[in-house]
Amino acid sequence: MGKDTIADIITSIRNADMNRKGTVRIGSTNITESIVKILLREGFIENVRKHRENNQYFLILTLRHRRNKKESHKTILNLKRISRPGLRIYSNSQRIPRILGGIGIVILSTSQGIMTDREARLKRIGGEILCYIW
């Protein structure tokens, strides 16, 4: 059986966010770097650093937390894996779902790389729906 790196990074980020951790350390691959760049660009995480340890590269993510009047920290990051190795989900450009009326994002793997739902609609291309983030 293969390892699902996308599910691993989603789980790591979700667990760190629920436990109010400030940073997350994940393994660096081309797919994880593309997804992290999208998260950084969309404002779901604050900072990304690339770290090398024993000839292995890691990404260290700094999570963004919002202060609330009642709670000291509010969990604002919700991630859900959609397409998985056992069941791939594909969509064309007209049927890409909108998350919370456009507030959330859908990350797709297309023939032109990994991108958000807005970019895929503008380029009029579909692809594999990797995950929802809101």
UniProtKB/Swiss-Prot annotation:
It is found in: Plastid, Chloroplast. The keyword Plastid applies. The keyword Cell membrane does not apply. Coiled coil: none annotated. GO terms for cellular component: chloroplast; ribonucleoprotein complex; ribosome. Its main location: plastid. Belongs to the universal ribosomal protein uS8 family. PANTHER family: 40S RIBOSOMAL PROTEIN S15A. One of the primary rRNA binding proteins, it binds directly to 16S rRNA central domain where it helps coordinate assembly of the platform of the 30S subunit. This is Small ribosomal subunit protein uS8c.
